[in-house]
Every structure is written in structure tokens, then in C-alpha cells.
Amino acid sequence: MSAYRREADYMIEDGALPHEVDEAMTNFGFPMGIFAMQDLAGLDIAWAMRKRRAADRPADERYVEIADRLCEAQRFGRKSGKGWYDYSQNKSGITDPEVTALIEAEAKRKGIKRKPIKRKEILKRILMAMQKEGQQIVDEGIATSGGVIDVVMINGYGFPRWRGGPMFLAGLT
């Protein structure tokens, strides 16, 4: 489900920081946040895919270039010692002021005035992105019900089992 990754990207461009998004997710019950997960998987994998799909991206679609800038700086995540977080001194990663500066510079370049986003709002936006995309998948007939989406989110994406799934939370099962 790429929708919640995109929403997380929008939030860091709009005013949140990666560790704030990740903390909102882990406090909710995810085993790790989206940015820590990207660092674990390797930022270069998604970067290669984004480059392949660039020509097909709608011109009017918002595109956040921050992850691309990290990759251009050879920050591929844990495998390179730096990504969204700095792993050079701590295997679990620490917030890196270089990433914060890069985020702020990219937002400024695009004319975005960053404003802090509260953790409650971060979580709401992440869940709404999951729910909207999940409903679209059901509407297109790709999945038979919201319950199927929840099973995938719990077993494949680490959604906290005891929460029931994003579709369950929205009453869409």
C-alpha cells in the first residue's frame, strides 16, 4: 500500500520529521515506523522504481523528492550506515540533523511553509490513507472485502493485530 508511504512523505514535507511519523506509528502498535522500515529495506530499491516510473507520473501529482535527495547523497539506509536515520554510531539509528536540514531545504525550495504536525494528526492521516486505498482496492474488485485488506495489513505490513486493521477501525469490514 503505497498510499500511506506517500502520505508520510507529504507530512515530512509539510512539517513533521521522520522520527515523529515513526513514533506515532510505533506508539499505535506498529513494530516500526515507515521511515525506519525504508532504511531497513534500502532506500535505493524504491529509488530505482521511482526513476523507472518517473515518465508515467502525472504532471499534476504531488511528488516529494526528499528520499531521492537522500539517495543522491548515498544515504541508502542501514546498508550504507545512513538513510533517514544515522546508523554509524548506533545500530538502531538516531535522528540526523543533516536529514532535518535537507527536509527543510526541500520544502523551502518548493515554497512550502512547514508547520508542526501533532502525533495524533500524523496517525489520523496515515490511517486515512490506508483506509482510502483499501476501499479503492475493494471497489476495483481486487479484494473481496475490507476484512481481506485487514488480513494483508496485519500479516504483511505489521499493522497491530489487536487494532483489527485499518478497515475495521473505519467500520469498512
Regions found by a protein language model. Name each.
Residues M1-T173:
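N-terminal glycine-rich phosphate-binding loop for ADP-containing cofactors
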